[in-house]
């Protein structure tokens, strides 16, 4: 009994519905690689995060003086001072200076921007617009500074202004504060210096672009993740309401941050986060395929299908996703990039091999195998497939386009010198004998196309030559036909002349004979008349 593996999101209501047949496609070198859920996103709102860069340390019984904190504070001030000055230059141009421009009533320091594109000027406008919220958040800096909580909400009345985060505070609370009275000051200082040094290294890496110009270089959420430390998932969940995991959103880079204010005295940084709106399209899957060469009609070929398709229910489209962000389980796009597929391509995806189109290939660097869920799918007619455990060569019959090698076939496989351990069984319970016509193979490579064009041009030249020869023959036949027509006409005229002559002769003969008869009768009458005259005289 044959078991088909078909992906189709919706229920097939009509018998003509088309779904992707994974098993059949795998047998011709078109292997499913990844399936992702399609979602759309747009930047719609903003949130603010207050990052407290200097942790609070509880006082100890022996009144330790931590020199590492003082040195860390000094180094951090040197790091953040250029950023703070740059933000102040952009957000607060000097009153006497006329070198600034207004966007909707907002004054921007053009000199601080330098050479800026439209997008960079827009970022500067956003930075200036955020100053109102930044000042409201900074007004509550004392409450933020006093707390030793790793994360908490900054509220003004009932309105949430921001989320305060102390990335290293969580480690201080859970490890350092519990050991303050059990270790010597030197050991605690060294341990704290290690944590602060590592965190400072991350900050230097994160904010290196912002040292030039924070308005022109927004920080990505990946860099912000280093800034937030272990509090990143909690911050993401607090700022973004979605069922998609924080790891997926962060890895896609959908959230970007921009430093809008730096409070050097308190070592606090206010970061504006652009929060996307994410909508997941139901019943929409984006399937990635990996094509390897196959043995078709005694030559190495590759199937002509897109590397990525979109399937909604029983309909398929090509989906390039050039402007989308991909994660392991999701694909985030700002708009639909679907492109129509021909009916033949859809039939091929459904497992109708007679509708598939292949292209012949040549060369030694073609993709000829792929690992699939612990098994290997390979074109063993174009590369050497040797099983080492047990030891025997793997032969691919002529009627098989590729070979699927699983644990029942081989345990250790060598492909052109590369060794692989097979750890799984194949889920394909059957293999069809493929029959593919020669008309299904076309050339798509530029070199092959030019070769085929040369053949076509040669055929056209031969055709032109034959046409000229045929025209010459036709012209000869035409001249001979004219001469023949003249001869025939002459013969006809001659025959007509002879017939007319014969008729004239016959008529003359008859007329002469009639005249003689009439003359004879006339003479006879004259003789009788003279005889009568003689009798009368007597």
UniProtKB/Swiss-Prot annotation:
Q: Name one Pfam family in it.
A: Fusion_gly
Q: Gene3D superfamilies annotated for this entry?
A: 1.10.287.2480, 6.10.10.110, Head and neck region of the ectodomain of NDV fusion glycoprotein, Newcastle disease virus like domain, YojJ-like
This protein's species is: Mumps virus (strain RW)
Q: What is this protein called?
A: Fusion glycoprotein F0
- InterPro entries in UniProt: Fusion_F0_Paramyxovir
**Note on domains (UniProt):** The 2 coiled coil regions form a stable six-helix bundle.
Purpose of the protein: Class I viral fusion protein. Under the current model, the protein has at least 3 conformational states: pre-fusion native state, pre-hairpin intermediate state, and post-fusion hairpin state. During viral and plasma cell membrane fusion, the heptad repeat (HR) regions assume a trimer-of-hairpins structure, positioning the fusion peptide in close proximity to the C-terminal region of the ectodomain. The formation of this structure appears to drive apposition and subsequent fusion of viral and plasma cell membranes.
- UniProt-annotated location(s): Virion membrane; Host cell membrane
Q: Could you give one GO CC term from the UniProt record? A: host cell plasma membrane
Instruction: List the coiled-coil residues.
Output: 128-156, 452-477
**Sequence segments annotated as region (Fusion peptide):** 103-127
Family the UniProt entry places it in: Belongs to the paramyxoviruses fusion glycoprotein family.
Query: Where are the residues marked Cleavage as a site?
Result: 102-103
């Amino acid at each position: 009994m044959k078991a088909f593996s078909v992906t189709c999101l919706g229920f097939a209501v009509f018998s003509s519905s088309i779904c992707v047949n994974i098993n059949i496609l795998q047998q011709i070198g078109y292997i499913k690689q990844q399936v992702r859920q399609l979602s759309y996103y747009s930047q719609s709102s903003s949130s603010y995060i207050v990052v407290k860069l200097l942790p609070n340390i509880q006082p100890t019984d022996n009144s330790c003086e931590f020199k590492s904190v003082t040195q860390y504070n000094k180094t951090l001030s040197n790091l953040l001072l250029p950023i703070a000055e740059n933000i102040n230059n952009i957000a607060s141009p000097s009153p006497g200076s006329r070198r600034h421009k207004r966007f909707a009533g907002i004054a921007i320091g053009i000199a601080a921007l330098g050479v800026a594109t439209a997008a960079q000027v827009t970022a500067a406008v956003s930075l200036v617009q955020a100053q109102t919220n930044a000042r409201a958040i900074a007004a509550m800096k004392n409450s933020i500074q006093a707390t030793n909580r790793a994360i908490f909400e900054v509220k003004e009345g009932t309105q949430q202004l921001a989320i305060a985060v102390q990335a290293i505070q969580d480690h201080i609370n859970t490890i350092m504060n519990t050991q303050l009275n059990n270790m010597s000051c030197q050991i605690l200082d060294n341990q704290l210096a290690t944590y602060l040094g590592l965190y400072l290294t991350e900050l230097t890496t994160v904010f290196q672009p912002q040292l030039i110009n924070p308005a022109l270089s927004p920080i990505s959420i990946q860099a912000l993740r280093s800034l937030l430390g272990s509090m990143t998932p909690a911050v993401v969940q607090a700022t973004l309401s979605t069922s998609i995991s924080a790891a997926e959103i962060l890895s896609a880079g959908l959230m970007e941050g921009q430093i809008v204010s730096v409070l050097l005295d308190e070592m606090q940084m206010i970061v504006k986060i652009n929060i996307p709106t994410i909508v997941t399209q139901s019943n929409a899957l984006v399937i990635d395929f990996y094509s390897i060469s196959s043995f078709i009609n005694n030559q190495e070929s590759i199937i002509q299908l897109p590397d990525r398709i979109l399937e909604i229910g029983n309909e398929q489209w090509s989906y390039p996703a050039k402007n989308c962000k991909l994660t392991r389980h999701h694909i985030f796009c700002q708009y639909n990039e679907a492109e129509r597929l021909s009916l033949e391509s859809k039939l091929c995806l459904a497992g109708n091999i007679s509708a598939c189109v292949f292209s012949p290939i040549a060369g030694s660097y073609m993709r000829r195998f792929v690992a699939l869920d612990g098994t290997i799918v390979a074109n063993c007619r174009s590369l050497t497939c040797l099983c080492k455990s047990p030891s025997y060569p793997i032969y691919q019959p002529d009627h098989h386009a590729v070979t699927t090698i699983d644990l029942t076939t081989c345990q250790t496989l060598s492909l052109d010198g590369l060794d692989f351990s097979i750890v799984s069984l194949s889920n394909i319970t059957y293999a069809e004998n493929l029959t593919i016509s020669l008309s299904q193979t076309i050339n798509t490579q530029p070199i092959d196309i030019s070769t085929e064009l040369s053949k076509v041009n040669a055929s056209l030249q031969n055709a032109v030559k034959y046409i000229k020869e045929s025209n010459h023959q036709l012209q000869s036949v035409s001249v001979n036909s004219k001469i023949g027509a003249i001869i025939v006409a002459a013969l006809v005229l001659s025959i007509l002349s002879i017939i007319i002559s014969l008729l004239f002769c016959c008529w003359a003969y008859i007329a002469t004979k009639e005249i003689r008869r009439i003359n004879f009768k006339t003479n006879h009458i004259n003789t009788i008349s003279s005889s009568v005259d003689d009798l009368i005289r007597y």
